[in-house]
Structures are given as C-alpha cells and as structure tokens.
Amino acid sequence: MNQNEETLVQALHRGDRYACNDLVEQYSSKIYHVALKLTGHPTEAEEILQETFINACKGAEKFEGRSSLGTWLYRIATNNGLMRLRKKQMPTVPLEMPVDREDQSSFWPRQLEDWAWDPEKITLTDELRQAMDEAVETLPENLRAVFVLRDLEGLSTKEAAEVLGISASNAKVRLHRA
C-alpha cells in the first residue's frame, strides 16, 4: 500500500466524509469496468458500482491493509457482481405462464424476464469487441471473474486470486479453462 492509499484509509477509518468522495473519484472507472465485464449490462454495472462504494465506505474499518485498497475494492465489486449473477440464474417464468392456484409456491415467479430495449448494445459497431463480450458472458461465473480481473483489468494472477479468495495456482487453472 502506497502513502496515498494509507492516508486515504486513515481518513476513511476516521469517518472523514471527503475520503469517500476521494475513493470514488480514484477507483470508480476501474470498478465500473469490472462490473460491466462481469454482468454485461451497464445499468447493473452502475448498481454494483454504487453498492461497492457504499459497502466500502460503511465498512472501511474492515479493511486490514493486507492487500492494496484497489484489490479490496475489486473484491467487494466482484462479490457484488457474482451475487447478482447467481440471482440471475434463478429460473425465469414467462408472464403468460398459467398459475396453479392450489400450489402457492408456484404462484409468484422467482424472477421476471427483462425485455427492456438496450440502445447501447444495439449501437455497438465494433464486431471484435462484441464477439469478445459475448464469449466472456458465456463463461461460467468462476471462470469469468478471474478472466475479467486478470486479462481485462490487468491485475496480476496473484492479485486476481486475492480478490477472489483463491490460491494463485487455482486462478491459473481457471484462466487455462477460460
């Protein structure tokens, strides 16, 4: 951890309200990029970004300094993103599906399908980037997370492993599989 990070962490521990602003200014673009690559949706990435900084500012005392401040934020963002991906994997139910009134457990669908039109996806013109994004989205979440952190965000294998709470050798195996 460099001197600048130490000063910022001390200010966060003291509850300095400007320290959170500094934290957001310093890391928001990197965290947003990770969240976007994990989810593939700008709106969800923004929500993850907000959740990450809320969690970080409220839980600053939990930061022990064993890693860099950026690595800690990546971990929070990755955990938030993976939780969202897990929620998304719940079965979806079309709105037209008949409801069995006798079986109350099937009365409410677990998750409705999102049919919203996303103009950003439609206007993507770079075919290579689109193909890469599509390929990343098809990866299972455990492989996607390590791939995004190391190969797209530029973290070292060791740093990506720290963020995900796995060993460096496990990260290498996951990268190989991705």
Q: Which residues are covered by each model-predicted region?
A:
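Helix-turn-helix DNA-binding module
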Residues: 3, 43, 133-170
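Short, charged helix-capping/linker segments at alpha-helix termini
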Residues: 13-22, 32-51, 168
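Residues within the DNA-recognition helix of helix-turn-helix
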Residues: 27, 174-177
